[in-house]
């Protein structure tokens, strides 16, 4: 959009990111912790799951494919299990994407405490 307010907000965001390069390291570190935690909990529960992640952007797929590489791969995942996961996380205060065809995103304001809480709630998920 060429809206002046949107352009100003975009420029302000870029200036903040340029001045605070450590934001990327922070987001990547949190993303890695979240991915590892989700995968570890899934192994403990014997749940077939993989997490596709780039930095702080990720999607949980209920499948034994690793990684999920295509739309056809994603369609073959357990969509009912994803629905249960979504409802569980949402009911417990985490507004994650309602479809495994979307990604969740971490941001600079997320903390290790947020990740720990997410993993605590995910651990209580009953597939």
Where are the regions that the model predicts?
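Conserved N-terminal phosphate-binding loop of PLP-dependent enzymes in the Aspartate aminotransferase
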Residues: 1-127
